Amino acid sequence: MGPSGAGTRGGQAQFQWEEVRNDKQKGRYLGQSIYAASGRWAEGKDLEWWSKGRTTQSAINSENSDKEKYKKEILEIKEREQRMLAEALGLPQPSALALTSSKAANRSSTNTEKDSRSIAHSTSRSRSTSPANRHRRKEKERTRSNHRHGSHRRHEPYRTHLSRHHRHSTTNYHSKRDDRYERRREHSPNDGGS
């Protein structure tokens, strides 16, 4: 005997709504309608309930311990990278205690006002407004930009896009050719002239 017309999976005779109503985990049974609502049923519902933390104290404690484990794992990876880098560069191996103490020293020294002032002073460039310094700065910038873009040739007006050697060789070639042509014209018998 096949399934009844009321359902395709069968078991309709055994199904009781009362059992579902009394079940503590009825959301698991009606998962599609309650936990993954769609359309107008999704209005006002938190559709990302699954990505949020749990509310029981044991679940919160386990999440916190997982976060601590993750932090420790990342710290171990960084220390391992430091050791491998020191080994590759031929430096002495840093100990774990030295790594943690150097991190603490770095944190305390970067927060001091004196260090921040000295860093700011060392990074700031002196911009004197005297004409000599201004001229020197402009010359330096000009040579830097000329060197960068190959525009140092622009300052010599006799140069073309051709190299000096090529330009001279072609100029000499053309002038010699023109001279030969002129000489031939002068000595040719078909002048029709004298």
UniProtKB/Swiss-Prot annotation:
Skewed-composition ranges (Basic residues): 133-169
Basic and acidic residues composition-biased segments: 175-194
InterPro entries given in the database record: MMTA2_N, MMTAG2-like
Source species, domain of life: Eukaryota
Stretches with biased composition (Polar residues): 53-63, 98-111, 119-132
GO CC aspect terms: nucleus
Extent of the signal sequence: none
Region of interest (Disordered), residue spans: 52-71, 86-194
Name the UniProt record assigns to this protein: Uncharacterized protein C6G10.10c
Organism classification: Eukaryota, Fungi, Dikarya, Ascomycota, Taphrinomycotina
